[in-house]
Amino acid sequence: MKAGHLLWALLLMHSLCSLPTDGAIRNYYLGIQDIQWNYAPKGRNVITNQTLNNDTVASSFLKSGKNRIGGTYKKTVYKEYSDGTYTNEIAKPAWLGFLGPLLKAEMGDVILIHLKNFASRPYTIHPHGVFYEKDSEGSLYPDGSSGYLKADDSVPPGGSHVYNWSIPEGHAPTEADPACLTWIYHSHVDAPRDIATGLIGPLITCKRGTLDGNSPPQRKDVDHNFFLLFSVIDENLSWHLDDNIATYCSDPASVDKEDGPFQDSNRMHAINGFVFGNLPELSMCAQKHVAWHLFGMGNEIDVHTAFFHGQTLSIRGHRTDVAHIFPATFVTAEMVPQKSGTWLISCVVNSHLKSGMQAFYKVDSCSMDPPVEQLTGKVRQYFIQAHEIQWDYGPIGHDGRTGKSLREPGSGPDKYFQKSSSRIGGTYWKVRYEAFQDETFQERLHQEEETHLGILGPVIRAEVGDTIQVVFYNRASQPFSIQPHGVFYEKSSEGTVYNDGTSYPKVAKSFEKVTYYWTVPPHAGPTAEDPACLTWMYFSAADPTRDTNSGLVGPLLVCKAGALGEDGKQKGVDKEFFLLFTIFDENESWYNNANQAAGMLDSRLLSEDVEGFEDSNRMHAINGFLFSNLPRLDICKGDTVAWHLLGLGTENDVHGVMFEGNTLQLQGMRKSAAMLFPHTFVTAIMQPDNPGIFEIYCQAGSHREAGMQAIYNVSQCSSHQDSPRQHYQASRVYYIMAEEIEWDYCPDRSWELEWYNTSEKDSYGHVFLSNKDGLLGSKYKKAVFREYTDGTFRIPQPRSGPEEHLGILGPLIRGEVGDILTVVFKNKASRPYSIHAHGVLESSTGWPQAAEPGEVLTYQWNIPERSGPGPSDSACVSWIYYSAVDPIKDMYSGLVGPLVICRNGILEPNGGRNDMDREFALLFLIFDENQSWYLKENIATYGPQETSHVNLQDATFLESNKMHAINGKLYANLRGLTVYQGERVAWYMLAMGQDTDIHTVHFHAESFLYQNGHSYRADVVDLFPGTFEVVEMVASNPGAWLMHCHVTDHVHAGMETIFTVLSHEEHFSTMTTITKEIGKAVILQNIGEGNVKMLGMNIPVKNVEILSSALIAICVVLLLIALALGGVVWYQHRQRKLRRNRRSILDDSFKLLSLKQ
C-alpha cells in the first residue's frame, strides 16, 4: 500500500470521526483600552448649525462647569490589533465612534478572540448570536463551573484570554433571515456598568458564501454596511464617574452625585457615542444596496424609534421608514436609497430628539442617472389648513363607561378635568389639521365616517403609482409644516428643517401657503408580505415636539395598486378606524402660556405644586379624548374591520392597545393587543364574532387609569348573514382556587451575593430584600391561583416536574381550537375575585362575574378559530388570565396565570403538546406591591413595629416594593427550568404591568426561532405590557445558563434566573427510566430546528445518538484498519530497507573481494 493511500484513509477517518467547522478560522486580536471620548467633537449642534452658546439644550449636556462634566468623558473601549503583539492598531471607520471593531463570520466559521486587558479593572467579552462553551462565555455569574471554565468570566488588568466561538447551523441565519444577522458583544462582569463605560461592539453572522476572501472580509451582497447603536448612555453608571468628576468639573467638591440635574447632564442621547449631529458622515451611493445594522442598549428610557428621512427600509420583508429599538434589540434593515441629498436619521421619541439623538446620512448620485419613478396612477389633491381651536378632552362630561362625572372630587378623572385656580381643566387651546374642498379654503370637507378622528387631521390616501399634492395653509400663530412617513419626496417637500445645505421653504409661516408633492413609487409601497394598505402618519416638524403636542398630526394610508375604490376607501373592508394613542403633554404645547392665561391661574399656587400641575396637563388620550369620550365606534358582527393604529410621544408612550371581546390579526398573527411606540404604526384586521359593548384601552395600568380608554360596539346587524356556527368539542375542565399565602420573592440570597461578591447591604438587591429601615423585605402576603384535582377542592395538583417553574403563576391552562374550557373557580381569599382570560370567547358579556369569599363559580370559555394560531403563528399561541374585579390591584396581588391555545391535533390526552418535549410559561413583571390589596397587612406583618413610621409616599419605600420578577422570583430563585440536550422547547413569554415593563429577555448560549409567517433566528425576546410571545428552541448546549432581562435597572434589580441544559447521556438515561415506568416512548416529530445536520444530511433529533454511536464504531474500526495498514506499510518499508541493507552489504563484500584480487 502506498503512503498516499494511507494518508487518504487517515483523512477519511478524520472527516467521519470529528465534527469540526467546515468554514474559516477567524482570528481577532482585541485590546481593552482607556480613552478620552468627546461626544461632540465639532463643538456645536450640527443639526441646527448652532454654537453651544446659542443652544441651551445642547450646552446643558456638552459644556463643562463647576459641577458639570461636559461633553468629554474617560471611557474604556475595545480596540483591534493586527497580531498578538498588540502594537499595531487596525483603524476602523470614524462613524463607528467608541464601538468596538466589527466582527464578521459565516455559518461554519470559528471566531477566536485573543483578548488582552490593558485597562485598570477586570472586564470580559460576551457575544450574542454565536455558539460557545463555558470557557468562552465571557459572563460572570454563579453557574456551578470552576477552574479553567471560569477564566473567561473576568480577565484582570494585564491579563489575557482566548475566546472560542463558532457559528453552527443552529445559530446561523435561517432561510427567511437576511444574509447577515445583527448581533453585539460586550463586557459582562457587571454588564450594565461595563457597557455604560464603553465596552460594546457589533458582530454579524452570515449565510455561507456571503463574505469574500479578503482580509478583513467584505460582504459580497451589499455595497454599504452601517452599524448604529441608539442608546442613552448613562455616564453616572460608568466605572470612571469619579475620575470624570475630578478631571472635568472645575469644583469637584461641589458635585452631588445624587443630584437629579447633574445625573441628567450625564445621560448622553447618542448614536455610536455622538450627539447633536456630530456622528461622522455616513456616505453611500444612490441605487446601491445598503444594510443597516441597528441595535440598542440601556435602561427603561431606551425606547427608540429610528426614523430615516427621505428613503424607505425593508425589515423582515415589511416596508417601513422607522425601526423600533430597545435594550439588546437587534434589527437588520435593508435599503436601496433613491433620493440623493443629505438626510436626517433621528430617534423621534420626543425627549430623545430634543436631547440630540440625531445624525446625517448622505446619498450621492455617484454618476448614476436618477431613477425614473413609475408613476402611472392618480394625482390626489388635498387642501389642509392648520386651525387653532379650543379642544375639550372630555366633551360629554362623564366617563363613557361608568357614567360618573369627570369632575367628581376624589375620582380618577378629576385630576385632569377639575378646573381650579391651580388647574386648567379639560379644555385647552390647540391646533388641528382640517380638510377643505379646494385651494380657496372656504368650504370645509366633512365626512361622516371620519367623526371619530377627533384631534387628528384628515386621512390622506394613495396607491402605489400615485402622486399626492398637499396644499397647506397655515392659519395659526406659529410656523408649521407637514412631514410625512411612508412616501417619497424631494428636498423641497420634506417638511423638516435642518442643516442639509438646502434653503427650500419647507415651513409655512402664519397665513402662508406651501405646496408639498409626495410620490408612491413601487419600491415605496407595501411588500408582498404586507397587508393591502399600510398605516402611516403625517405631522408638523417645524418643532416636532411642540408641534405634535399642540395637536398637528394626521393619518396617511398607502395601498397596493387597485386596493382603493372609486370613493377612495379600501376594498374588502367594511369599516376602518384610525386611532392615535399618545400622552399629549400640554406643558410642551405652543399654547401652554395661553392656556394658563385663559384659566386665570394663581401663580403662587402653581409654584407650590409644579409637579402636580404639570402632571394634570399630561392627557392620556385616544384621538384627543379621555375616559371613553371618543365617539362610539359601531361595527357589525362578521364585518371585516381595519384598525389603523398610530403612536406618538415620548419614552412613556409605550402602549399595548387592547381590544376587549375580540381578537386581531397582525401580519397573520393572532393577538389581543397591538404594541405602539412613538412614530410606529400598525394595521390590524378584526372580524368580530362577539356582540356587545367592549373597551379599547392601553394595557399599561397607569395609562388606563389616566383615561386612555374608548368604547366599540359590535351589533348583530340585519344586513349581515350569520356565519356558520363554530362546532365545539368536549370540554376540558380545570378546578382553580384563589388562596392567600405568604410569598417570598427571594428565599435564598446566596446566588445574588456570590455574583456581586458583596455584603447584603452593599448589594443592588438590598433595597428590595432588606426588611430594615422601614422596608418590608422579600416576603409578602399574596393571593394566587392554584389547581385542584376535582370540585371538592381538597387535593391540590402537585407542583413538581413540568409545573415547578410556574412559581407565583396559576396553572398552565391548555386548549385547542374547537374546545370548550370550563373553569370551576372557588374563592378562598378574603375579598372578591374572578377569572378573566384574553383571547377566548367568554360566555358572559363584559367583565366576568366576581366570586365572593367562599363562593364557587363556573366560567365557560369557548375557543373559536380566531382564538387559536393565525396563519403566520406557531402551532400554539399564548394568552393570559387574571382576576378582573380590579384588574390592576388583583394582578399585583398575585392573581395571574398562563393560557395556551393550539391548533387541532397538537395536544395529547394528558394536555401536553405532541410536537414539543418541554413547555415553559414565564411572566416578566415588576410586581408593584404598593398597588396590592394587601399592602397595609404587609406593612403590619413585615414592616417596623411602629407602622406610623412608614411613609407610603417615600420614594425609597415605593421603590423597595417593586419586585422585578420572573414568575414571582428574583435573583435566580426560580426553579424547574431544566431541559435535555436535543429536546424541543416551547417558551411562552408573557408581560403585563406599566410603561416601565419593557423587558428584553436574553437566553445565554442558545438561540431560538420566532415564527412570523417564516422562521427567524434570535436570542432576545422583546416583551411589553399585554404582549404574549411564543419562541421555540432545540436545546443544544449543555450547562447552566443565564436568562435575564437586558434592561439595566432590571438586571440589577434581580430579573434573572438560570436554565439548565443536561447532556445527551443524562437525557437518554432519563428517557430509559421514563420508558420503563410509563411504558410510553416520547414522540419526536420534526419541526424547523428538530433536525441536526450531520455529514451533509438532515438527521432527526431522535436518531442523533444512534448515528453518533454508529459513527464512533466506524471510527474505531477505521482507526484499527488505519493502524493495521500503517503497520503493514511500516513492515513493508522495513523489509525494503533490510533488503537494501543486505544488497549494500553484499555489494561491499564483492568490492572487498575484487580489491583483494
Curated annotation (Swiss-Prot):
Belongs to the multicopper oxidase family. One of its GO terms (biological process) is multicellular organismal-level iron ion homeostasis. Disulfide bonds join 180-206, 285-366, 533-559, 636-717, 876-902. It is found in: Basolateral cell membrane. The keyword Metal-binding applies. Residues 24-206, 218-366, 370-559, 569-717, 730-902, 910-1066 form the Plastocyanin-like domain. Part of a complex composed of SLC40A1/ferroportin, TF/transferrin and HEPH/hephaestin that transfers iron from cells to transferrin. It comes from the Eukaryota. Cu(2+) 5 binds at residues 655, 698, 703, 708. This is Hephaestin. It holds the Pfam family Cu-oxidase_3. It comes from Rattus norvegicus (Rat). Cu(2+) 3 binds at residues 188, 1004, 1044. Binds 6 Cu cations per monomer. Keywords: Calcium, Cell membrane, Disulfide bond, Glycoprotein, Ion transport, Iron, Iron transport, Membrane, Metal-binding, Oxidoreductase, Phosphoprotein, Repeat, Signal, Sodium, Transmembrane, Transmembrane helix, Transport. Its EC number is 1.16.3.1.
